[in-house]
Design a protein with these regions (language model features):
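N-terminal extension/subdomain marker
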Residues: 1-98
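Terminal, contiguous helix-loop blocks that mediate binding/assembly
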Residues: 6, 118, 125-374
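Structural recognition of the beta-strand scaffold that forms the well-ordered cores
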Residues: 12-17, 44-49, 100-104, 163-167, ...
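Gly/Ser/Thr-rich loops at beta-strand to alpha-helix junctions
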Residues: 20-23, 106-112, 170-174
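Short, solvent-exposed loop/turn and secondary-structure capping segments
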Residues: 26-27, 57-58, 112-117, 177-178, ...
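Surface-exposed loop and adjacent secondary-structure segments within mature catalytic domains
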Residues: 48-72, 99, 103-143
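Hydrophobic, aliphatic-enriched repeat segments that assemble into extended interaction scaffolds
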Residues: 88, 92, 96-104, 110, ...
């Protein structure tokens, strides 16, 4: 007997949930939202979930609130590029489609290499979390294992095969991370700040992602409005929509302006930061470039190219941060966004607390493309 080939669908979306961590309850809550969101949608929503204390599964969420276990796996490391690559390939084989989307769901820390995180505790507790803070996300964590951005880029298609890549994870709207991932998808939806563990409202956004022409701006608006209109203690969110085929031009414009500027003389304390770390790692990209001097025409060209790259952004007045540095707002756990362009950047500087990050940053494709060497 020969099985017939799978029937090609209009769109297949894979949600890859690396939930072998403290976000497992939020993962299942999001799956419940997906069941609601797919109530009357004709398309393939495939969920790989590796839950803490459970068995990794490949699920199909269908209209009518139906959830089917397609495959189960032995215990495995979902924060492994080999597992991620296998799941992507398996999903495309089982559910071929005219177009594909990918949601990466877990913890996240932008471009910062996983190996730096534990070591940085010896450097002024750079990554120390506030013990009273609610959960936020990264990408990706399975127990003590993580995926570096360079490895993630290698595990994803290099021909923008995905129509979109959505990060339901903290800090992934970093220009360094997204530049390295620019060939994975046509559009990337990501937040340059922290995302609360409740994440995106999948019941609301799935109809937009499965539309004949996906409505990415509406997905972003719905995400921020979900928190903006929330009555919870933490009604905060930010997001950017990035057109990836503009990122090379952004790097070129950044290089031209950066060469004319004096970044070492910038007063970093005056640059919009996006978290409450003891020493800030994520700053607003445009605000930083506005404070390093340089040729006015080249700056205008950079700012114009940035508007072509970040085609939509939205944010609440404040954003939440789980870190333990000074803050404002409820319980002093927030950061006020006086300016926001939709992308973050690392600001290179000679500080002992940043030594390991500084060394790693010089090796990022963004730093090399822009000519950031110090």
């Amino acid at each position: 007997k020969i099985d017939p080939p799978p029937v090609k669908s209009g769109r297949t979306i894979l949600v890859y949930m690396a939930a072998d961590n403290n976000l497992v309850n939020s993962a299942w809550q999001n799956v419940d939202q997906m069941l609601v969101g797919m109530e009357s949608i004709d398309g393939n929503l495939i969920v790989y979930i590796d839950p803490q204390g459970g068995t990794p599964q490949l699920l199909k969420i269908e209209s009518g609130g139906k959830k089917t276990v397609v495959e189960e796996y032995a215990k495995e490391n979902s924060a492994s590029t080999s597992v991620l690559s296998r799941v992507i390939a398996r999903t495309k084989a089982l559910y071929p489609a005219e177009s594909y989307g990918l949601v990466l769901w877990s913890h996240g820390l932008g471009w910062a290499p996983a190996g730096v995180i534990p070591k940085s505790y010896s450097a002024d507790d750079l990554w120390r979390k506030d013990p009273n803070a609610p959960l936020t996300k990264w990408f990706a964590q399975d127990g003590a294992n993580y995926i570096d951005i360079s490895d993630l880029a290698g595990a994803l298609p290099r021909d923008r095969e995905f129509d979109f890549l959505l990060f339901d994870a903290c800090f992934m709207g970093s220009v360094e991370a997204l530049y390295e991932l620019r060939n994975a998808a046509k559009y990337i939806i990501a937040s340059p700040t922290e995302i609360l563990s409740s994440g995106f409202s999948y019941d609301a956004i799935l109809p937009e992602l499965f539309a004949d022409t996906p409505r990415f701006e509406e997905v972003c608006r719905l995400f921020v409005d979900y928190y903006r209109q929330s009555s919870s203690t933490w009604p905060y969110a930010s997001v950017g929509l990035i057109k990836t085929d503009e990122l090379d031009a952004l790097a070129a414009a950044a290089k031209a302006f950066y060469a004319s500027a004096s970044p070492a003389s910038a007063d970093v304390s005056q640059v919009q930061y996006l978290e409450r770390m003891q020493t800030h790692v994520f700053h607003d990209l445009l605000d930083y470039y506005s404070k390093i001097g340089g040729d006015a025409a080249l700056y205008a060209a950079f700012a114009g190219q940035l508007r072509k790259t970040v085609v939509y952004e939205d944010h609440t007045e404040y954003v939440f941060s789980a870190y333990s540095g000074p803050g404002v707002g409820p319980f002093n756990m927030c950061v006020k966004l006086n300016t926001f362009c939709g992308l973050s950047t690392y600001v290179p500087r000679d500080l002992s607390a940043l030594q390991l990050l500084q060394e790693s940053y010089k090796e990022t494709p963004w730093a090399k493309a822009v000519g950031i060497a110090y």
